[in-house]
């Protein structure tokens, strides 16, 4: 049976299928973890420890050395994405109620959901798209996108926008596994190779545990809103990313569109933030569902939009070249 190959045909499948299975488990048998106990309970409820190991391995997979072009392109995209998420947070905090919207079509929408959906780029999706439509250097620009993974950037955005306050030691605790992994991976290439193999392996495990915090009725209630959130992520982050790629990154805007997705890891952010700041706990389930839907939507639309943009840019460049030759 080609189970893995079938799952991978779904955009973000290795994250979203286990997430859905976990949500099924939580919806129809919410006490399963307590009933079975031991290791089974650990797999069902172990979101934070599994993610801690994943962050460590993610840090170890990042190589410090990179060309100037790669760093400029990567830095431009990462900083722009984070800056846009900060602006969205600052505006949303003045419009959306403190505990999120509780009634009506926008029920479940919160500043936490908006920031979590917008501040992280799907690095793997970006790299695969740019390998097809961009240069080798542009494809390699995902190197710094891994720094967005995890709750740290979301914490910084929420903190600096005045939406939440975090003690300094909480910031350190959030980033420490990543930094230790990063240090070890760059001190020893063999360790980097060893730990980086676990990055993809751990995704289904933390996705399943994360799914066990979601009730499927919440997903049903936020489905259409989640689709609109996914479209909003592409528009709100995509336009500034295109402009930044052209003006600062030295590109033609293709990399900007390719970076306008939501990362699968962003699905875990609301729960992790809620663990650190209990005030966010009531919003976390709906925010998780919204972000999960946004991940699916952006994973489907971003490759299509990038393809269309790239074709138009290349056609325009070819036309200009022909006109220049004629003259």
UniProtKB/Swiss-Prot annotation:
InterPro entries: 2keto-3dGluconate_permease, 2keto-3dGluconate_permease_sub. Belongs to the KdgT transporter family. It catalyses: 2-dehydro-3-deoxy-D-gluconate(in) + H(+)(in) = 2-dehydro-3-deoxy-D-gluconate(out) + H(+)(out). It is found in: Cell inner membrane. The keyword Glycoprotein does not apply. Its main location: membrane. The chain crosses the membrane at residues 10-30, 42-62, 73-93, 95-115, 139-159, 163-183, 199-219, 224-244, 254-274, 289-309. It is a multi-pass membrane protein. The lineage of its organism: Bacteria, Pseudomonadati, Pseudomonadota, Gammaproteobacteria, Enterobacterales. GO terms for molecular function: 2-keto-3-deoxygluconate:proton symporter activity. It comes from Escherichia coli O7:K1 (strain IAI39 / ExPEC). Catalyzes the proton-dependent uptake of 2-keto-3-deoxygluconate (KDG) into the cell. This is 2-keto-3-deoxygluconate permease. Keywords: Cell inner membrane, Cell membrane, Membrane, Sugar transport, Symport, Transmembrane, Transmembrane helix, Transport. GO terms for cellular component: plasma membrane.
